[in-house]
C-alpha cells in the first residue's frame, strides 16, 4: 500500500474525497495485479484466471474493462451473457472490479494510519500477532473473573448496511454509488460470504467484514466509556453516531425477576473484550443481573442500529467455575487447586487450607476426532483407518503430509494443561500413516513395520518434544512435569487446516 501513495498525483486532502477516478487508471490495475501475484495463499491473479490469456494480454483486458465502465449501458448486461469476441463474461469483469475495490478503498485507511504514527517511534512486535499471545494474558486475568459473555457476531442481512458502514469512512459519493451499483447488479447474496463460491475477491470480503465489525465495536466502546454518565433510573439508548445525544430511537426495558428494570449499564473497570473468528467474549466480575443487562444490550444494539435479527440464544453467559468456554480451539475453564500449608508459631503448629485458581485449557478431543473422521483419517469412534486418496502419492510425500499435520496440531495444542488427548491425536495420525503406506504396498501393518523398523515413526517426534526432553531429565518426576508443562508459541499467526498442507 506504500507503493500506492507514490502513484497518486493529488494531495492527501483530496485522496479521501476523490477515489472514483482511480477506477479508470490503468496503473491501479497493475498495482492490484502485482499484489494478486504476491498473495500468501498462492491463488492465481484474477487477471490471469482464464488459461487462454497470457500475461501480455492483461493490459488489453484492463482497457476493455475501462471502456465498459465508461459505457455503463454495456456494463448492465445479465451475467449469463457471454461476449464471444472478447472471451469474458461480465462476471469475470466484476471480479476484476472487486480486486480494484480491495486496493482502492484501503487507501484512505492506510493514509490515516500512517499519519497517526508520524512522530512516534514504535517498534514492530510480531509476537503480538500470534494467536497464542492472548493465552498468557487470559491466564493472568481470567482467574479474577467469574462470568464470560460469549457473543456470535452476526452478518448484515442487507447490502445497503455495508454501503452505509463504508459511508462513515469513505467520503467519495461517486465511488460509493459505483460500489452500490456493482453489489446490487452482480452480487449473489447466497454465496456472498462463501470464499469458495463467492464472486467477490477474498481480500475485499475481508475488508467489508472488518469494516462492519469496526463500526459495531466503535459504537460499543463509545457507549462503554460513557456508561457511567448515564442515569440508571431513566436510561434511554442513543444509537446514532451523528448527533449522538440529540436522537432518541428506542426506549428499552428489561423485565428481570418479575420486576421492571431499566437497562442501565454500570461502569466496570475489570471488563475485558476479545474478538476472534466471528465471535467475541466479554469477561467480567459482574453479577448475573448485570451480565443479563449486557446480553440484552448486545441484542438491541444489533437489532436497532444494524437492522439485524439477532436472537438472544446467540449470546451465552458462561460461569467459568462450572462451564467450559470454547475459545480458539481450546476448552477453557477455571480450575481450583487446593493447597495445604503447614504454619508454626512458637510451639503451636496448624494447617492452612488455601485454594489457587488457575486457567485450565483442554483439547476438545470430540470435535477434533470428528474433524479427523470427516477427512477420513479415522472413524467416528477414533479408530485409525488408511487414507485411500493418498495411496497414489510417493512414500516420502505421504510421510511428509502426515508429519506436517501432526506437527501443526502438536505445535498449536502445546498449551494444553493435559497432554493425554494430544497423545491420542498423535497416535491416530501415526497409525493412519502406517496403514496408508501398508495399503499402498499391499501389505499388513505388522509386516510393513517389521520390514522398515521403528525409524519410520521417529519422524513424528516434534521439535518441542525434542527440546522439552533435553530440558527435563528422564525420571518419573520429570515425566510428570513434562506431562503438565504448557508451552505457548508466538509464531502462530493463523489456524492451520488439518488437511491443507500446502
UniProtKB/Swiss-Prot annotation:
Pfam families: Intron_maturas2, MatK_N. GO terms for cellular component: chloroplast. One of its GO terms (biological process) is mRNA processing. Its main location: plastid. It is found in: Plastid, Chloroplast. It comes from the Eukaryota. GO terms for molecular function: RNA binding. Keywords: Chloroplast, mRNA processing, Plastid, RNA-binding, tRNA processing. The keyword tRNA processing applies. Usually encoded in the trnK tRNA gene intron. Probably assists in splicing its own and other chloroplast group II introns. This is Maturase K. It comes from Sisymbrium irio.
